[in-house]
């Protein structure tokens, strides 16, 4: 039998991992109602991960839209490094996203190398990545982490997509203290051509990519400590 190499890396072409430890985990329904559901999962020690976390996420439909509340509790005996990110895709119709107006209230972005590993922060001033004023996305390809995000009076930042002709609007909001980062991904590199540029992923994140190595905005949960912070999607 020919030799095989088995790797647990989820991004083997770039030599690192992506999308966290529970993307493919099995979640169970804890509570369910007509307008809400709570799912739970226990993250056990495994290769490359030595801590125990109880995880839950509640999805609730309200009059204003969808509210998502993730929660993580350290049920182990040692402090656990932790970071959370979600990966929702937004659209305002069936048109390509390059025909959509985008607003991102962020003053800085994370510069990366050819493996998409962080190399430093840069201001968005005078770049084509500055969306602090709404404008058409056009042909710009984004797979970009933003920070220095400006919050509204309620303490949340908001990223908005608007269709300039139909008037459709969708907004993703997140608690700015809990989520000082967001990733914006236009999907141009997705393997299925039909999915490319059909929506924009707006990803609220507690820390930037590679935070377990850099320590940047990495949370550390003491035994018994819990993280919980909402984000949501509001249609216009």
Regions found by a protein language model. Name each.
Residues 30-37, 60-65, 94, 165, ...:
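A short, structured loop/turn motif at beta-sheet edges
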Residues 6, 12-15, 233-236:
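Short, charged beta-turn/beta-strand-edge "cap" motif at the junction between a beta-strand
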Residues 43-88, 93:
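Acidic, contiguous internal or C-terminal segments within carbohydrate-active enzymes
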């Amino acid at each position: 039998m020919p030799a095989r190499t088995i790797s647990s890396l989820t991004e083997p072409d770039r030599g690192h991992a992506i999308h966290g430890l529970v993307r493919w985990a099995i979640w169970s329904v804890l509570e369910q109602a007509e307008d809400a559901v709570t799912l739970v999962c226990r993250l056990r020690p495994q290769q490359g991960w030595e801590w125990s976390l109880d995880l839950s996420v509640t999805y609730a439909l309200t009059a204003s839209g969808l509210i998502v509340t993730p929660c993580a509790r350290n049920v182990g005996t040692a402090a656990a490094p932790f970071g959370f990110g979600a990966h929702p895709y937004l659209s305002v119709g069936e048109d390509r996203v390059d025909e959509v107006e985008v607003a991102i209230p962020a003053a800085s972005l994370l510069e990366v190398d050819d493996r998409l590993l962080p190399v430093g922060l840069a201001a968005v001033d005078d770049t084509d990545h500055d969306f602090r004023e709404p404008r058409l996305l056009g042909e710009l390809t984004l797979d970009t982490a933003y920070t220095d995000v400006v919050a509204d009076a309620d303490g949340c930042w908001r990223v908005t997509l608007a269709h300039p002709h139909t008037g459709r609007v969708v907004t993703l909001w997140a608690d700015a203290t809990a989520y000082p980062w967001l990733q914006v991904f236009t999907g141009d590199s997705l393997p299925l051509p039909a999915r490319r540029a059909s929506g924009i992923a707006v990803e609220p994140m507690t820390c930037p990519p590679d935070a377990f190595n850099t320590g940047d905005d990495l949370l550390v949960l003491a035994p018994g400590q819990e993280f919980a912070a909402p984000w949501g999607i509001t249609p216009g």
